[in-house]
Amino acid sequence: MDRGLSTGTNQSGAGLRERAVTSQADLNVITENPTVTNASNGKDKAGKTFGRTPDGTVFTVPQTHDMVSQLLSPSEPKNLSDLVVLTILAGHIFLLWILPSGAKIPVFAVIYLFWRSCYNAGIGWLLHNQSHHKTLVRWAEKSQIFVNPATGKNPYPQLYHLIKRELEIKISKDYSFEEAPLEYNTWLVFRRLVDLILMCDFASYCLFAIACSRHPANESVLMTVIRWTSGIALVLFNLWVKLDAHRVVKDYAWYWGDFFYLIDQELTFDGVFEMAPHPMYSVGYAGYYGISLMAASYKVLFISIIAHAAQFAFLVLVENPHIDKTYNPPPPRKRTITEHDAASQRSQSPDTPNAPSVSEENVPNATTFSSPPPAVHNLLGFHNLDLHRITDTSSILVQFLMFSLTVLTPSTPWYQFLFVANAAIWRLWYSVGIGYLLNRQSNCKSWTRHFVKYGETPHEAWNQWKGTYHLSMVMCYASFISAVWKMYTLPSNWGYGLAILRHVLGAGLISLQIWTSVSIYESLGEFGWFYGDFFFDESPKLTYNGIYRFLNNPERVLGLAGVWGAVLITASGTVAFLAFLSHILSLGFIQFVERPHMQKLYGRSLRQDAGLVKSLKRSLPPSLRQLHGSVDKIFDESYEFIEEIIDTARPKLAAGVNTFVRDTTALFQKYPARVTISRIDADLAGYDLRDYSLTVEASQLPLDEGDLSKEGDNARTPLDRRGDLENLVFPYGTPVKVKWTAPLNHSKKDWIGLYKVTDNTSREVTRVSSQGRWVAVNEGFYDNLTCERGILISDVVVSTSQGDNGEKHDIATGEVVFSGDKLFWTQGVFEFRYHHNGKHNVMAISRPFEVRIPRFEEEDHFDMSQTAVETSLLPVIQNCFDRDPEIAPETPEEQYGSLVERDGKFAKRVVFAVHQMFGVEFAPEVVRSDGNVRNLAWRICNAKRVLAPYSMSRDGATTPTESKE
């Protein structure tokens, strides 16, 4: 139901805070949940909508109605499932009536939490598995409940006729149960389950609120009127959000239809979806808090917060991954067709420039810095914390010092004054000081010029600026938190007054600011967060995605919600002064620093009204729209007046400052355990283990006996092999094909898993989880698709002579391939195990095989050939990228596919391989930044040259070695 996802694609326009983002970020178009409108191109002249199943089947999507109309409208036909839902709802109401007063609240709290769990956990689990494995459709396919009993293949004919009657009663036009695709019928049945859960969820919540409702003692009439008026207003607003959302998304997205099939229509971005991100999950829960107000119960408020948090978890864990997979796939890679084209592209400076060749390295070139450096080592986030970096170390030390002083000093008026003054000074520096530096950088590039004057590069100036801004931001908020700590007093009586409400609202505002900051960072990236367009004059390009789709300057209000949350929690006038100062200075920063630069950089392309403002303006009467324009004009004229005063006073202030400095100079010189359950099938009679076998095939590395000079005398002789079998040594990441044999009556749920040899002590039973590294031997017998990826051939009948008397008999054989996530991305010795009937009984074990990354041998670190490195590195990277033609390069200069930037697992595989091959350790961000094999090879060669003096290997430049014979 609650599809908290906006509809449509990005809209171009203009806004103040949306700074330019890097080119890579521009590729990541953040598309909210697509929905359809009646005006879309996917309808024919008769107004019919067409759907498309995953196998390409096109069908007419009949018109359906929302669940409230279906259940409660007398004009809508009723079926058995409607009566079941209405009966259960009536049972809830009857239960509230018969329960004693003392039992109503706990009983309905449990009932509501049960239905909420069914919603977020139950439906979430079903949708997650449907998205990844088509589980619901596979259940319907395996059970054959939608197959006509006349064919004799439906084991449940009565259930078939019941479902057919139930669905056809509801959908009278453009629908035939027999002809509708399996996916659509499955979705219709899933809808009935959703109707039951969602109606019971909301009904039990309302009944719980009724059970908890009370009239506070000594509450004035005015407060009662305000409380009920506000509550009713929130409920009505919630109702409008739901109705407008359903108008836009229809039943298709309301019931998660895109988990089952897609609509052949254009995407839209309309109505409430212009107002807020994920409106069904954000503002769509305003009614819960309105009901809490009317009930005047903290119990209702807290259970509303729990429900709201669970809904956001549902969004993050279920819906967002499905949306990214369905509507935001990585764009196709631009391929290099010929060597001539590759040379042409290199000469035209592509987005990721290729590293220089050996002959080019020593030629001095004038480097241009119009584009920002690639983001390799970001600053923000705990996952980017690096104690080797002075910015991070300084930030941690100053915060530790600040909070230590806060905790160890008493909260006397004198110390309170010092901490408040410290917070005010840091806020002034963060807004006025940083604003002045950015203004000078915008007008005359003063920050960059300073570093260029001392021989540094603009990239160094950019890095130093990021450190300065980051430390200033950290100290601004650390000092504010310290001041709030000093001014806060724990309530002596939590039940008196509005103490609990103040803390709940304050915590909510703080959470809102944190979410806003995270959303801004996700939209702008590291480059935009640190005002990169003040430093690099790349071609101006605005994007309006994420939170900027709805607001031009989210930090103007939402970005400072947390400071006002601190005011509510402390109930302190001093903290209110700090919050007011912070808000005024932030507004001034936007008006006098950001806005002039944005207008200069982007001009008329700036958007005047964001999505929220447009929605509000459309809902206002003409007289109020005119008043809004007049107010905007007054504010603009006021800002212009203040700017004129500052421009006039600037020379006088400068002269006064110079005099003050001159006089002053004269006076002063101067940082789980998992439980595995092995399932055993006791009935193994009738299966001949000699018919089971596993044979491993893959491209092999040349055998290397190793360096025997360290061994004893007897161990230095070459291995004496008695037989034709040799060691199996496979390259890192290469797909491994497994040929299996089994009796003809083998279970169709048999499966093959990949394990480290040392992980299992038993040869009869596997007691270690496969962790997803397994493939079924037959298709269609498991409720997910992942286990079937890799099946090549199944149940081919062949003859064999194995047996006691050597007689030939038939067995089944097949082939599967393990690749990608089904492999161990490390070195070691592994084996495959054939398991029986979906359990962990081992029927056959393959020969052990070794996965090895060959060490790159170079004669001299200083003469290391980049071409040789490229040649050795290319096949390894192709394996690391699953040999996927959409992302794996075919030549050293070909760019990686965009999925490498999104999914960090590919870069992690590469850096592990590079570390083992060359002894050089890189961060995964380096692989993504380099963008192709040639750049990475150049970086490896350069790193080897830099680290050669510190090498302790036998061939190290500073290590004396014996002369080679």
Swiss-Prot record:
Recorded topology in the membrane: Multi-pass membrane protein
Record's subcellular location: Endoplasmic reticulum membrane
Pathway: Phospholipid metabolism; phosphatidylcholine biosynthesis
Recorded GO CC terms: endoplasmic reticulum membrane
GO BP, one annotated term: phosphatidylcholine biosynthetic process
Single annotated GO MF: phosphatidylethanolamine N-methyltransferase activity
Function, as annotated: Catalyzes the first step of the methylation pathway of phosphatidylcholine biosynthesis, the SAM-dependent methylation of phosphatidylethanolamine (PE) to phosphatidylmonomethylethanolamine (PMME).
Family the entry assigns: Belongs to the class VI-like SAM-binding methyltransferase superfamily. CHO2 family.
Lumenal side: 1-82, 128-192, 242-274, 319-394, 438-470, 525-559
Pfam family, one: PEMT
Keyword annotations of the record: Endoplasmic reticulum, Lipid biosynthesis, Lipid metabolism, Membrane, Methyltransferase, Phospholipid biosynthesis, Phospholipid metabolism, S-adenosyl-L-methionine, Transferase, Transmembrane, Transmembrane helix
This protein's name: Phosphatidylethanolamine N-methyltransferase
InterPro entries, alphabetized: Phopholipid_MeTrfase, Phosphatid-EA_MeTrfase_fun
Record's catalysed reaction(s): a 1,2-diacyl-sn-glycero-3-phosphoethanolamine + S-adenosyl-L-methionine = a 1,2-diacyl-sn-glycero-3-phospho-N-methylethanolamine + S-adenosyl-L-homocysteine + H(+)
Composition bias, Polar residues: 344-368
Ranges of the Cytoplasmic topological domain: 104-106, 214-220, 296-297, 416, 492-503, 581-965
TM region positions: 83-103, 107-127, 193-213, 221-241, 275-295, 298-318, 395-415, 417-437, 471-491, 504-524, 560-580
Gene encoding the protein: choA
Region annotated Disordered, chain positions: 34-54, 326-368
EC number: 2.1.1.17
